[in-house]
């Protein structure tokens, strides 16, 4: 599909609301990916008796959307008065747990038999240990009337007493096909002009994060009115994978000086070493090479990333990484 085969969107209407919100699923069944987790939540919606839940997984995988959809399905028109949602932008210290959450749990709301009020705590792993201890007690006292749903990136940061009171539902990063499926729905609805390589670039930059994919798509359409590879990488401000791939190819072909020049160009463009090494990791992961070679390159990339995160001479570390790559190549040739 080319630019001429689809009209540009009406920009006056297209950006009134972020596409992440505009196309957020309203039913649990419509949540993309993580079929096992979604199936468990659908069972809860059918049964009507929701346990306390911990939804754990990387950002942008559908945790918050799933629990909001579940709350809508369980409570219907009573949703507004029977749900308390607190996210990372809200103060969720000890006072909030003792006052706001406790007052909500004490509030009388008329619901269908077997239904409960729901407290949704987004990014619960950022709550202090003291607040979590207070929450544990509140969960215990009001278990007959109120259920709690905690969304977090890592469940290990939730204290054990809360974990033991909850059913844990784990979410994983979405596959490229799952992200592409949702992007195609949005592209068709918004009449976005695109080329397939542009959507591939969005999937690459999203790295399994649906929220990131939709934000990148909307930002590209907003800035350039057309989704192609070049525009996506300009908007996302990430090193172009083709440049990084050529750099790796030069090392593996024995053209070390050319690889160093390519690295210097990327560095001079203002990309952070973390951006460069993250793109490098993804490129190597998908690069067609001998398995032994790929394993060694990934190992060296991991060590270099660790040193860069410690703040050690970043450009020097990247140059040293290319030298390690060349050494691995020579060792592989000798054997």
From Swiss-Prot:
Name of the protein this chain belongs to: Replication factor C subunit 4
GO MF: ATP binding; ATP hydrolysis activity; DNA binding
Family: Belongs to the activator 1 small subunits family.
Subcellular location: Nucleus
Species of the source: Oryza sativa subsp. japonica (Rice)
Complex and partners: Heterotetramer of subunits RFC2, RFC3, RFC4 and RFC5 that can form a complex with RFC1.
Gene that encodes it: RFC4
Tissues in which the UniProt entry reports expression: Expressed in roots, leaves, shoot apical meristem (SAM), flag leaves and panicles.
A GO cellular-component term linked to this record: nucleus
């Amino acid at each position: 599909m080319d630019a001429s085969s689809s009209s540009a969107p009406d920009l006056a209407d297209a950006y009134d609301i972020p596409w992440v919100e505009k196309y957020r699923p309203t039913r649990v069944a419509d949540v993309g990916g993580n079929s096992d987790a979604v199936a468990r939540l659908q069972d809860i919606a059918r049964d009507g008796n929701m346990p306390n839940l911990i939804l754990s997984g990387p950002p942008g995988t559908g945790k918050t959307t799933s629990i909001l959809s579940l709350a809508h399905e369980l409570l219907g028109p009573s949703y507004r008065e029977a749900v308390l949602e607190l996210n990372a932008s809200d103060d969720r210290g000890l006072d909030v747990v003792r006052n706001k959450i406790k007052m909500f749990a004490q509030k009388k709301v008329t619901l269908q038999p077997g239904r409960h009020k729901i407290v949704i705590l987004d990014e619960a792993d950022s709550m202090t240990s003291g607040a979590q201890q207070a929450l544990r007690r509140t969960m215990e006292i009001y278990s007959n009337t109120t259920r709690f749903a905690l969304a977090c990136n890592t469940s290990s940061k939730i204290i054990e007493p809360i974990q033991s009171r909850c059913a844990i539902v784990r979410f994983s990063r979405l596959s490229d096909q799952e992200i592409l499926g949702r992007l195609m729905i949005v592209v068709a609805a918004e009449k976005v002009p695109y080329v397939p390589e542009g959507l591939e670039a969005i999937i690459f930059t999203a790295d399994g994060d649906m929220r990131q994919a939709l934000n990148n798509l909307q930002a590209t359409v907003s800035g350039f009115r057309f989704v192609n590879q070049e525009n996506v990488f300009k908007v996302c401000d990430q090193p172009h994978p083709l440049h990084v791939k050529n750099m790796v190819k030069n090392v593996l072909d024995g053209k070390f000086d050319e690889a160093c020049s390519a690295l210097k160009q990327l560095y001079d463009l203002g990309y952070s070493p973390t951006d460069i090494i993250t793109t490098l990791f993804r490129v190597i992961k998908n690069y067609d090479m001998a398995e032994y070679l790929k394993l060694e390159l990934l190992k060296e990339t991991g060590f270099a990333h660790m040193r860069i995160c410690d703040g050690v001479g970043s450009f020097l570390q990247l140059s040293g990484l290319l030298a390690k790559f060349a050494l691995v190549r020579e060792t592989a040739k000798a054997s």
